[in-house]
Curated annotation (Swiss-Prot):
ARM repeats lie at residues 74-115, 118-158, 202-243. This is Hsp70 nucleotide exchange factor FES1. Keywords: Cytoplasm, Repeat, Translation regulation. It is found in: Cytoplasm. The keyword Transcription does not apply. GO terms for molecular function: adenyl-nucleotide exchange factor activity.
Amino acid sequence: MEKLLHWTIAQQSGDKAALEKIGEPDQKALNQLFGGPDEATLMKESIKVVESTDVSLEDKEIALENFEMLIENLDNANNIGNLKLWNPLIDILAKEDTPVELKVLICGIIGTAVQNNPKSQEDFNETEGLSELIELAQDDKKFELQSKALFAISSFIRNFQPGYAKFEKLQGLKLINFDNKNNKYQLRILSLISSILSNGLDDSLKAQFKEAKLPHYLASVLNEDSNTSLVDKSLNIVSQLNQLNYEFSLEEKYEINRGIQVVEGLSEKLNIDDLNNAKQATSS
């Protein structure tokens, strides 16, 4: 409160130097002082705005953007479950007449809330949201929505076995498609594969990756040397596969080694640990 008092005095006097020194005030303290709504109330009100039939699309977008900013805070992200807001969000996402713009924002909210957050992963797992995300991720006619849905799925299943088990049961592995050459799409697919591998690699998954020619695809990304983010992610997945005892064939090793030679000139821009681990994975 003392900092808030100093900030208020500096604000009223127009003392810019003092304002810069003090920094921004704590939002919760401001709300307590001026009687504004707390963040939990703001979250609930945002969803009410989106559910209303009397509100413009623009205002609904603003409400969801504000909601996403709030849930960047871990406590607020966990409050989605505490406030029982997951199901309303999924209901809005699932409605056919919900504008694409809102669906994109909701997928972003899901991905942000569950990212590296076990509590929110568990809460989201209690909903039917994953099924809806997988359906949206299959629609390549709405690229931005597809991309955000893939982001949300990857965030949800990363290092979370119950979520991955549901993903597998819902045949989410069918989302892996190497035919689309859009860089952003490829990056989303590689992120999804990395999230899958964060839960381990059994014989069935090894066989599916063999059949899908994953190592060949990773090698092709390295050989193209066109996008540093894609190269970095591909090297990371090669490293993950090696750590999980994936047995690369001689042909796979040859292709990946050739790709590594192509990208070695980018070493200053790449994760050096992943580069070295990828070399080790295919050297023997």
